[in-house]
């Protein structure tokens, strides 16, 4: 599941820099829906165009923020080692009555680098088009505009262009995150399914060079990131005679 939450500038930048890995919230009805493995998209209160995506790795339940502060490492909450947190600090934001009613929650998180893919698919990137354009072109059976980097991403190290490098997936774990992300994973499946509907089995006639090779790299990557999903191998079978991209396999070390 993907949750949307807002943050003030200071905690937003602490999470972005990696100096804060536990977000504190009242355990109200909305927060009770959060589960380990879910994703949270944080947007900054005073600039909602600034966003980042994290994955939930653990949930810490307490009766009050004072208990939470006493139990969890202050560095994970975002305090420097030479700072002593005030146990009553959160009372100004969440009165004691609400803490007693709902309980409180420490959401332990891991920063991902998926937000750039979400942003590019929503709004385009530089001269590249958005996901809806990409899907429309695949339904019309011909790639016309530019969007390949963030719709069919490759493993890091295969390309030297700015966009290729920027939108590269750094390793197998990040590919698994991408596939598990409720928006990115669903879109990857949706647009990949369109490829199987093509009458042609020649990727060059659809994507041209070098994008046809990028699609093969992408299919190879996600074949290993999501081995339970047969879709990616089916595309390799259709367009590449079942042959994986050797360079992707080498980088993955599989």
Regions found by a protein language model. Give the residues of each.
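Short, solvent-exposed beta-strand-terminating loops
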Residues: 59-69
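Compositionally biased, charged N-terminal/linker segments
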Residues: 1-36, 111
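Short, charged beta-turn/beta-strand-edge "cap" motif at the junction between a beta-strand
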Residues: 44-49, 151
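Contiguous surface segments at macromolecular interaction interfaces
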Residues: 67-112
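A charged, amphipathic interaction segment
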Residues: 189-254
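Short beta-strand-centered aromatic/proline hotspots
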Residues: 50-61
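Short conserved beta-strand and strand-loop elements enriched in small hydrophobics
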Residues: 37-45
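Conserved, aromatic- and glycine-enriched, well-ordered alpha/beta core segments
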Residues: 35, 112-213
């Amino acid at each position: 599941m993907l949750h949307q939450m807002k943050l003030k500038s200071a905690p937003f930048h602490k999470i972005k820099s990696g100096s804060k890995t536990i977000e504190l919230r009242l355990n109200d009805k909305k927060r009770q829906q959060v589960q380990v493995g879910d994703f949270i998209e944080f947007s900054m209160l005073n600039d909602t165009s600034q966003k980042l995506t994290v994955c939930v790795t653990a949930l810490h339940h307490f009766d009050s923020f004072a208990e939470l502060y006493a139990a969890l490492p202050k560095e994970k909450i975002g305090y420097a080692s030479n700072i002593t947190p005030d146990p009553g600090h959160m009372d100004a934001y969440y009165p004691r009555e609400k803490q007693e009613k709902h309980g409180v929650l420490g959401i332990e998180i891991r920063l991902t680098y998926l937000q750039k893919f979400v942003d590019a698919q929503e709004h385009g990137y530089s001269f590249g088009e958005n996901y809806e354009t990409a899907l429309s072109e695949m339904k019309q059976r011909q790639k016309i505009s530019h969007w390949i980097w963030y719709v069919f991403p490759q493993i890091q190290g295969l390309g030297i262009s700015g966009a290729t490098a920027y939108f590269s997936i750094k390793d197998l774990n990040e590919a698994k995150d991408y596939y598990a992300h409720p928006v990115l994973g669903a879109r990857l499946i949706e647009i990949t399914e369109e490829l199987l509907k093509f009458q042609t089995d020649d990727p060059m006639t659809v994507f041209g060079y070098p994008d046809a090779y990028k699609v093969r790299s992408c299919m190879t990557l996600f074949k290993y990131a999501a081995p339970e999903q047969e879709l990616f191998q089916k595309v390799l079978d259709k367009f590449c005679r079942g042959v994986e991209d050797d360079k992707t396999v080498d980088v993955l070390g599989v």
